[in-house]
Every structure is written in C-alpha cells, then in structure tokens.
C-alpha cells in the first residue's frame, strides 16, 4: 500500500502559502502549515495549522517529527532541508527550487561562510522580493513535480 504524501510548510515566512494550497487542492493532498505562536491567527479557514513555541528551532523540530519518507516540504531553511532530505522527503524552496542531497554540503558551507561574514560586520543583500512571476514559477514547478511523481 503506497502512502499518500503530505505537504509540510515551514510557514513563518513562507510567501507562497496560497500557491501551495491551490496545488494541494488540485492533487487532493493534505497540507500542514507549521509556524511559531508569533504568527498565530484564529483565521485559519479550516486549514491544518500547527503552532509551536517561539524557540529558535521549535518549528524545525516539529517538522522533523512530522515528516515521512515521500512527503513534500517547503522551506527556505537550508539546515532543515538537509535533515529532511536525509529522511527521504522532497524539499522545495519558496522559489520552487527542488533541493538535492548532493548539493547540501556546498549550500551549508556557503551558509556558514555568510554567517561568519555577518559576525564580522559584513552584510550582503538578501534575496529580491517575491514577484508574481516568482510565485507562478513556484506553482508551476510544484505542479510539474507532482504530475511526474
């Protein structure tokens, strides 16, 4: 019996929640949004939200505990992505990039070097703001992935 995947979303700063809901509805997949209590809302519209303590890694820990092999994860957190890839999940960035295990070492190294630079007072520009085109690209990539799965 094949297990139906769920979509788990690192929801605190996820800009593509609406697109995720649209694709999940199309493919009849359950979506679980995981966020800290700092993002609590009573207006969850019947969606599956899990709110966790505001501690630094609370949402990550909950997502690690919930994720099963074959699940689809959406997160910008490279560290969380690397752990969940090792569990056999499929991890997407908010921009629709499908992370791959063989790329994680390099991505973690870059993240580490950037953190060291910030400690030294060197700051680089962050990512550009999400555009409608970026949202559409995310939706297209997630849809294509699910069609080919």
UniProtKB/Swiss-Prot annotation:
Question: InterPro entries in the record, alphabetically?
Answer: UPF0178
Can you tell me which family this protein belongs to?
Belongs to the UPF0178 family.
Name-wise, this protein is UPF0178 protein Lmo1456
> Which species does this protein come from?
Listeria monocytogenes serovar 1/2a (strain ATCC BAA-679 / EGD-e)
